[in-house]
Amino acid sequence: PEVLKYGIVCASAGNHAQGVAFSCNKLKIMGSIYMPVTTPRQKIEAVSMFGKDYVDIVLTGDTFDEANEAAIKYAQRSVKTFIPPFDDEKIIEGQGTIGYEITQQVDEPLDYIFIPIGGGGLASGVGAYLRQKWPNCKIIGVEPAGAASMKASLEAGHVVDLEHINKFVDGAAVKKPGKLTYGVCKEVL
């Protein structure tokens, strides 16, 4: 599409960045990928490997939230399209395909499934799919103790913005879950 010819921008502490980098390489689209300076070298190298010559990695901010804010500002200043890491219907739907893959790999419905939560996109997508396919499966979201923003939000009954997060839990260190992801997670977890 026309909008992609200018390139794309995303922010991630790892998994989303790798997926976007892979897509940039396959589709021959230039991408700017913002990651916190605390991102482990192994994740940075994976993004570089997947994106090859089609991605620029920008390390900025101590947390995902700071890198995300910088990426959004850059996308607004440029004519590039911002690809949100989790709080977007299409991203959630795409992550829901993992739920489908899970159902294809087992002979009968699972009793329990544990899903990691950062911003809640993966838990929303997989959880929504599995809730429809296996209504009796207990879906359990797992967050690090140092950045349990979804847990705090579910307990409060609304999206909560944590004051502090532990930067050590880089891949799931999100101060605030998405509004869409919170809405889905409160129904499926």
Task: List each model region and its residues.
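General beta-strand structural signal in soluble alpha/beta enzymes
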Residues: C10, L59-T60, F82-P85, I115, ...
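Glycine-rich phosphate/pyrophosphate-binding loop at beta-loop-alpha junctions
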Residues: A21-F22, S32, D87-V188
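Helix C-cap/helix->beta junction micro-motif
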Residues: L27-I29, S78, K133-P135
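Helix-rich "cap/lid" substructures immediately adjacent to catalytic or cofactor-binding pockets
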Residues: P1-G7
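Conserved acidic residues
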Residues: Y6, K80-T81, D111
